[in-house]
Regions:
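Short acidic, hydrophobic short linear motifs in intrinsically disordered regions
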Residues: 22-39
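A short, conserved structural fragment
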Residues: 57-68
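Short alpha-helical segments that sit at the start of domains
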Residues: 1-25
């Protein structure tokens, strides 16, 4: 299990970049699935949700739609990929 926060952040950023290349719209539920598959400690998920898209937003690769999606009873911010 991956418990190192920096390593988990790097995995989350890579997952977000891959998702942005392959989908027009994305939310954190997609990233969370990848984190589960990668073996990241669930205790890190909440912090990663807040940071994994920041770099892509800052670089102009994503746009915040201002909308939310609901997956399994949780709501997530919806982003539009500008590199899809």
């Amino acid at each position: 299990m991956i418990r190192d926060e920096y390593t988990a952040q790097e995995i989350a950023k890579e997952l977000a970049f891959e998702a942005a290349q392959n989908r027009e719209f994305l939310d954190y539920s997609i990233i969370r699935t990848g984190l589960i598959e990668a073996g990241v400690d669930p205790a890190l998920y909440r912090g990663l949700e807040k940071t994994c898209f920041y770099v892509l937003l800052a670089e102009g690769l994503l746009e915040d739609t201002g909308e939310k999606t609901e997956v399994a009873g949780r709501s997530f911010k919806l982003f539009k990929s500008l590199i899809f």
